Amino acid sequence: MAIPPSSAPTSLAEAAAKIAEELAPDLVGVQECDYWLERSGNAHQIADIATSISTPYFAFAPSIIGTPGEKWRKLQASDKRMITNADSATQYEGSYGIGIASKIEVVKWHRLDLGNAPFGAPLLIAGDESGPGKPRMLYIRDEPRLAIAATLAHGYTVINAHLSFVPGYNLRQLN
């Protein structure tokens, strides 16, 4: 099962343009972000968002290598743990994670691995790949979770965290 169920290549650009027009943000945090995955047209999504909203600084931190809900693995010691605007021309293995894009200069990027629940949980899913339909329960195993932080030139640090969906375990990750 592909998550999300559909991936029109223009939807990301349209959403980013709408965000830029309506909110004019200096910084955006993105969760469930793809990097060179087939399901999203092999896009570097946080780089595309950064370009769409005119933010020169961005970073992507993969939580897994591969596609969630399909075939994936945890990061290994040899995997790149942070991909930034400084090294975005290099293509790494397709992955899924979180990112930040900023208009304000980022002086340092940080990554904090939060682990994952040792078990999954049933989730109510509406429909399937063919479209909306009767809701059904599907057992989903938890993926490794993380937080990414940007220390900005003016001294503030902004954090984007993608916590577990498993009740209780997500509260543990906040500690």
Cite the ranges covered by each PLM segment.
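Beta-strand-turn-beta hairpins that frame and shape the catalytic cleft
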Residues: 94-108, 112, 118-126, 141-160
